[in-house]
Amino acid sequence: YVSKKFNLGKNPIDFVFHGGSGSSLSEIREAIGYGVVKMNIDTDLQFAFTEGVRDYIVENIDFLKTQIGNPNGLSEPNKKFYDPRKWLRIAEESFNQRLIKAFEDLNNINTLN
């Protein structure tokens, strides 16, 4: 409408895709075609971070029940498993992978060269 009314080119208005989390790739690409230049994905990023923590806990549950004692032995320490630096790093990596996917979905890889 705006393009026709004011005799402008394609996509003369930059749009923000509010609530973009959970959108399919085809929906994202369609939105870009309409002039979307920014997409909000905070919910997806929060979930990705939590997903990393969840998966780590599920995978290492027998090492997170006590400080000492696990499937490897009753006197084996578990510190390296419950150390927050370990599971927070896993969460950060999951978060990072979700960011990379968003950049790919939005055709925003190496665009500032």
PLM region descriptions:
Residues 1-12:
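Alpha-helix-loop-beta-strand connector modules within alpha/beta enzyme cores
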Residues 13-19, 37-41:
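Hydrophobic faces of well-ordered beta-strands that scaffold small-molecule active sites
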Residues 20-34:
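Catalytic cores of alpha/beta
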Residues 24-28, 48-57:
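Active-site-adjacent beta->alpha loops and helix N-cap segments on the catalytic face
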Residues 34-52:
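Glycine-rich phosphate-binding active-site loops on the catalytic face of alpha/beta enzymes
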Residues 58-113:
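Extended, intrinsically disordered, low-complexity segments
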